[in-house]
Amino acid sequence: MAHGARLGSVVTFVQDLDRSVSFYTDVLRLEVADRSATAALLVSPTGAQLILRAMGSNAPHTLGNVGVQYVIWAVDSQDDLDLCERVLRERSAYRQTRGSEDVTAVEGRDPDDIVVMITYRGPDQAPLRTLPVRIYGW
């Protein structure tokens, strides 16, 4: 492993598969590569993979407990980030936009109230050098 590991896929449990597939294909422009009655594999042109698995309408998700809190996605341009923000607003899923001199982040919530954050200038262009203060607010 001379170059270290890289993220391969993200698995997210959701309440309603159709609703979540619609959200992620619309907001992040992912495409459905495979699908069953209870799961879907969504992929991006860059190779990012999101696996959604339906857990039913009563499945809880609590922010702040042990486990992955959310995934931060990165786009290639400010125009792409603006498009993500617009789609989040159209879906009434937009929460806020924050920026620094290096990175701008748009935050929304998916249909299961899971945080979705999208940044322009991802880690390949603007790697983190310090811990983000936001992690202490959960």
Name each region found by the language model.
Residues 1, 61-62, 96:
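Short helix-capping and inter-helix turn/linker motifs at the boundaries of alpha-helical repeat units
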Residues 6-15, 61-87, 90-138:
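Vicinal oxygen chelate
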Residues 20-25, 113:
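Conserved active-site tyrosine of GNAT-family acetyltransferases
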Residues 1-18, 70-71, 125-138:
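N-terminal beta-strand motif that seeds the catalytic metal site of vicinal oxygen chelate
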Residues 31-66, 109, 115-122:
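Conserved short beta-strand elements that form part of the metal-binding/catalytic scaffold
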Residues 9-21, 49-57, 82:
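Short N-terminal helix-initiation segments at or just after the protein's N-terminus
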